[in-house]
Amino acid sequence: MSFLTLKDVDLKDKKVLVRVDFNVPVKDGKVTSKVRIEAAIPTIQYILDQGGAVILMSHLGRPTESEYDSQFSLEPVAKALSEIINKPVKFAKDWLDGVDVKAGEIVMCENVRFNSGEKKSTDDLSKKIASLGDVFVMDAFATAHRAQASTYGVAKYIPVACAGILLTNEIQALEKALKSPKKPMAAIVGGSKISTKLSVLNNLLDKVEILIVGGGIANTFIKAEGFDVGNSLYEQDLVAEATEILAKAKALGVNIPVPVDVRVAKEFSENAQAIIKKVSDVVADEMILDIGPESQKIIAELLKSANTILWNGPVGVFEFDNFAEGTKALSLAIAQSHAFSVAGGGDTIAAIEKFGIKDQVSYISTAGGAFLEFLEGKKLPAIEILKEKAIR
């Protein structure tokens, strides 16, 4: 790794500032999904075992910066963490002027987004945060694409900055899939809009042998192949881009299996009847909400040949059971594959949970935007600053 990891750093009797991703759902003062909290436990436990004091920082939701708002308070998260780790977790509401913490203790700081200057990573705020600790640990890959005070600025001014266990695992898994993949490699890029994934598709074309498109993205490709998509979600102004991607794929020998059959409905509704049709038979008042059985078979067959699979996005409206078959078939094909598989993005994780394949995916990324930017080949500011610190 081109940056320091937690295990490279002496933590004994050090105040260790850890940027975690505790942006979790809270309802009636209770955390309803603890996945992101659980993901940070190895880093927290390691620091405690090494004799360090833990100061945790995170954002929660999107409050108005510099204004306290109780609905975005991290106090319920501190309670949930205490239950999971079976240790007291102190909560610091006002923490910028100093945090009282001893070796072996954990303090959860209030929402970083209540601080003025967080998003712009002002020098004033960054220096203030850096002064609270001896070591900074970045362990929130989900926010690594943002140069903010608690992810980037603090690393600039603190004596030692390194990557936590979760962040290190994320980078290793993604680099294994993208920089040194075992071939053949397949990528699945789904979701509603091609515009948000265009640079991902272009970046992956040079790396994969199979590129599977799904959702609204696939509809734009179906249109690019000259078929009518009726009332379906697609992007007319990006049909030309889709045509270019298909031509480029052909020249590079990349297989893009555009759906040959689909499940359509007359309305976007959970109870709408799913009708299976060839793509050539879709009419004006129908909308494509899932791929059909033939397309499922083609995808499953292609994935059997892959040694590396990268998955971001569903291939249909899997939240509606009538239109979940395509994403279910895709999920099961990945689960049954011998390939090294990496999955990321909110909808993808929801599909993994719905179809019960969590243990069959090699690595599940907790990130959304940062995962996408990594797939685009972009540099992530919070990772770059760790690399710079390692050189100094």
Curated annotation (Swiss-Prot):
<feature type="binding site">
    <location>
        <begin position="21"/>
        <end position="23"/>
    </location>
    <ligand>
        <name>substrate</name>
    </ligand>
</feature>
<feature type="binding site">
    <location>
        <position position="146"/>
    </location>
    <ligand>
        <name>substrate</name>
    </ligand>
</feature>
<feature type="binding site">
    <location>
        <position position="113"/>
    </location>
    <ligand>
        <name>substrate</name>
    </ligand>
</feature>
<dbReference type="InterPro" id="IPR015824">
    <property type="entry name" value="Phosphoglycerate_kinase_N"/>
</dbReference>
<keyword id="KW-0547">Nucleotide-binding</keyword>
<dbReference type="GO" id="GO:0006096">
    <property type="term" value="P:glycolytic process"/>
</dbReference>
<feature type="binding site">
    <location>
        <begin position="345"/>
        <end position="348"/>
    </location>
    <ligand>
        <name>ATP</name>
    </ligand>
</feature>
<keyword id="KW-0808">Transferase</keyword>
<dbReference type="InterPro" id="IPR036043">
    <property type="entry name" value="Phosphoglycerate_kinase_sf"/>
</dbReference>
<dbReference type="GO" id="GO:0004618">
    <property type="term" value="F:phosphoglycerate kinase activity"/>
</dbReference>
<dbReference type="Pfam" id="PF00162">
    <property type="entry name" value="PGK"/>
</dbReference>
<comment type="pathway">
    <text>Carbohydrate degradation; glycolysis; pyruvate from D-glyceraldehyde 3-phosphate: step 2/5.</text>
</comment>
<keyword id="KW-0418">Kinase</keyword>
<feature type="binding site">
    <location>
        <position position="197"/>
    </location>
    <ligand>
        <name>ATP</name>
    </ligand>
</feature>
<dbReference type="GO" id="GO:0005829">
    <property type="term" value="C:cytosol"/>
</dbReference>
<feature type="binding site">
    <location>
        <position position="319"/>
    </location>
    <ligand>
        <name>ATP</name>
    </ligand>
</feature>
<comment type="subunit">
    <text>Monomer.</text>
</comment>
<dbReference type="GO" id="GO:0043531">
    <property type="term" value="F:ADP binding"/>
</dbReference>
<keyword id="KW-0324">Glycolysis</keyword>
<comment type="similarity">
    <text>Belongs to the phosphoglycerate kinase family.</text>
</comment>
<feature type="binding site">
    <location>
        <begin position="59"/>
        <end position="62"/>
    </location>
    <ligand>
        <name>substrate</name>
    </ligand>
</feature>
<feature type="binding site">
    <location>
        <position position="36"/>
    </location>
    <ligand>
        <name>substrate</name>
    </ligand>
</feature>
<dbReference type="GO" id="GO:0005524">
    <property type="term" value="F:ATP binding"/>
</dbReference>
<keyword id="KW-0067">ATP-binding</keyword>
<keyword id="KW-0963">Cytoplasm</keyword>
<dbReference type="InterPro" id="IPR015911">
    <property type="entry name" value="Phosphoglycerate_kinase_CS"/>
</dbReference>
<dbReference type="InterPro" id="IPR001576">
    <property type="entry name" value="Phosphoglycerate_kinase"/>
</dbReference>
<dbReference type="GO" id="GO:0006094">
    <property type="term" value="P:gluconeogenesis"/>
</dbReference>
<protein>
    <recommendedName>
        <fullName>Phosphoglycerate kinase</fullName>
        <ecNumber>2.7.2.3</ecNumber>
    </recommendedName>
</protein>
